[in-house]
């Protein structure tokens, strides 16, 4: 069992989703997911309790990011106050003592000059050489001018050579 503080949160990337991460990794996690906005809900002393709370909340919130929608900024507006209350009211009473009081919305701006219209994923196993103009970075994705996107995280361990002009 990981005996370090863990946070259960709501993040808005392609849609509102629930997640859990170590307290020390919170902003890194949200940025990796391409979250535009995020908010802490609960703080637990260990991963196990946080995971149990997340399972409860997965009954009313997704725990997956729709990466294509996230990259295309294709999302609806949400009311954070309503969604937070919905989440907290759904939890069993014995979890209420873990609520993060006065939690604020954290907002992120990603450097994207061109939002892709039709996302094409770059697969380095199929396409050994790719040339493109970088137009943005969002979450773990590099976005190129021709709507090609490269998922850096899913290519961990792959040797890549980048040339800039």
Where are these regions (language model features)?
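Non-catalytic accessory segments flanking enzymatic or RNA/DNA-binding domains
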Residues: 1-165
């Amino acid at each position: 069992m990981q005996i370090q503080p863990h946070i259960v949160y709501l993040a808005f990337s392609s849609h509102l989703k629930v997640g859990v991460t170590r307290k020390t990794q919170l902003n890194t996690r949200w940025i990796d997911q391409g979250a535009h906005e995020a908010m802490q809900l609960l703080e637990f002393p260990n991963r196990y309790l946080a995971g149990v709370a997340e399972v409860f909340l997965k009954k009313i919130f997704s725990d997956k990011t729709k990466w294509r929608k996230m990259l295309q900024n294709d999302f609806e507006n949400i009311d954070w106050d309503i969604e937070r209350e919905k989440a907290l009211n759904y939890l069993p009473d014995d979890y209420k003592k873990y609520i993060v009081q006065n939690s604020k919305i954290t907002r992120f701006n990603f450097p994207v000059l061109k939002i892709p219209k039709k996302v094409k994923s770059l697969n380095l196993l199929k396409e050994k050489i790719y040339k493109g103009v970088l137009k943005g970075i969002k979450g773990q994705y590099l976005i190129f001018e021709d709507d090609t996107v490269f998922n850096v995280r899913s290519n961990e361990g792959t040797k890549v050579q980048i040339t800039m002009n």
